[in-house]
From Swiss-Prot:
It is found in: Cytoplasm. GO terms for molecular function: ATP binding; tRNA binding; tRNA-uridine 2-sulfurtransferase activity. Residues 160-162, 322-323 are annotated as: Interaction with tRNA. This is tRNA-specific 2-thiouridylase MnmA. It comes from the Bacteria. One of its GO terms (cellular component) is cytoplasm. The record marks 139, 355 as: Interaction with tRNA. It catalyses: S-sulfanyl-L-cysteinyl-[protein] + uridine(34) in tRNA + AH2 + ATP = 2-thiouridine(34) in tRNA + L-cysteinyl-[protein] + A + AMP + diphosphate + H(+). It comes from Shewanella woodyi (strain ATCC 51908 / MS32).
Length: 377
């Protein structure tokens, strides 16, 4: 079977341009390195270790990932460098993660990791130590320079598009980055890897948060944050159970509540519909469209726009308030320098403070911010 080629929308290759590829030991970065080599770039790999596990830790499996990354680089005939960003990760990603959970919010550490590690610390290391012209990652997004300024577009594979996780990039960072697999479907990426005999061709995609791995989330979090048990109440104020800590729950959560089979309730499942931090109460309601779970909009802060300007006030655009959510039509209204009010065209369920809201104009990722509070009216 013939090797599948990426489309011509990729950046024009130049033989004397050096690209440092973030080699994770997975299939996406493996194929990214192969495609860039095929396009004529000078390619070298860089493996990042971002978490210090002890000798008995089986969760992050950094040693296994490094072994796979080295095998791929050997197969492709390219050099592999290694770097330890564990200190930067702890200071800039993990401590933020803990602080947000302590405040009862639900953060997304992958977004902060991309901002602080993969496209900051990694880019600085590639520049200062490895003399890179570009960096490349195995993310499913695309880059376009048609407007005269680098823009980030959704990946071709809608199920794998990762623009949601990369909204904190600036157009300057996008202009220094290449995303070869963003032009392909995931199945095509695996096909290329298999055709080229890369050891990662059938390697399972990584899921979850790297520093937690296969451990139970509650067990991991309890080692860093003390549990604060409290009551579970219905939206009407009836106490129907207890929780071990608000940090273990998120809006829209259905499983793990331990409150099935309640008297005088219907057969609809129970959902987390609110977290009352001042009373340490977890509020639940029945049905995925419970009124307390719905919102007509939200306020967001910590804004970042890829073009450093942002859309016009009152712009009619779309937003995702969580990964793999369908686009939601909305209008955006500025509320000060670093805050926006976003109004949905139709009510949306389970919008969660602490999560990122990412805005789009058709295929273009405009940027986003952190959801601060909800509008229910």
């Amino acid at each position: 079977m013939a090797i599948i080629e990426p489309t011509a929308a990729l950046i024009e290759p130049t033989a004397n341009k050096k690209v440092i590829v973030g080699m994770s030991g997975g299939v996406d970065s493996s194929v990214s390195a192969y495609l860039l080599l095929k396009q004529g770039y000078q390619v070298e790999g860089l493996f990042m270790k971002n978490w210090e596990e002890d000798d008995t830790d089986e969760y992050c499996a950094a040693a296994d990932d490094l072994k796979d990354a080295q095998a791929v680089c050997d197969k492709l005939g390219i050099k592999l460098h290694t770097v330890n960003f564990a200190s930067e990760y702890w200071d800039n990603v993990f401590e933020y993660f803990l602080a947000e959970y302590k405040a009862g919010r639900t953060p997304n550490p992958d977004i902060i990791c991309n901002k602080e590690i993969k496209f900051k610390a990694f880019l600085e290391f590639a520049d200062d130590i490895l003399d890179a012209d570009y960096i490349a990652m195995g993310h499913y997004v695309r880059r376009s320079d048609d407007s005269g300024q680098s823009q980030m577009l959704r990946g071709i594979d809608g199920n794998k598009d990762q623009s949601y996780f990369l909204y904190t990039l600036s157009h300057e960072q996008v202009s220094r980055s290449l995303f070869p697999v963003g032009e392909l479907e995931k199945s095509e990426v695996r096909e290329i890897a298999k055709e080229m005999g890369l050891i990662t061709h059938d390697k399972k995609d990584s899921t979850g948060i790297c520093f937690i791995g296969e451990r139970k989330f509650t067990d991991f979090l309890s080692t860093f944050l003390p549990a604060q048990p409290g009551n579970i109440e219905t939206a009407e104020g009836e106490v129907i159970g207890t929780h071990q800590g608000l940090m273990y729950h998120t809006l829209g959560q259905r499983k793990g509540l331990g409150i099935g089979g309640m008297k005088n309730s219907n057969d609809d499942p129970w959902y987390v519909v609110d977290k009352e931090m001042d009373r340490n109460v977890l509020v639940v309601g029945q049905g995925g469209n419970h009124p307390r779970l719905m919102s007509t909009g939200f306020y967001a802060d910590q804004l970042h726009w890829v073009d450093r300007i942002g859309p016009d006030n009152g712009a009619k655009i779309t937003v995702k308030t969580r990964y793999r959510q369908r686009d939601v039509a909305c209008s955006l209204h500025y509320d000060g320098e670093d805050r926006v009010k976003v109004l949905f065209d139709e009510p949306v369920a389970a919008v969660t403070p602490g999560q990122s809201a990412v805005f789009y104009d058709a295929e273009v990722c405009l940027g986003g911010g952190i959801i601060d509070s909800l509008i229910r009216e």
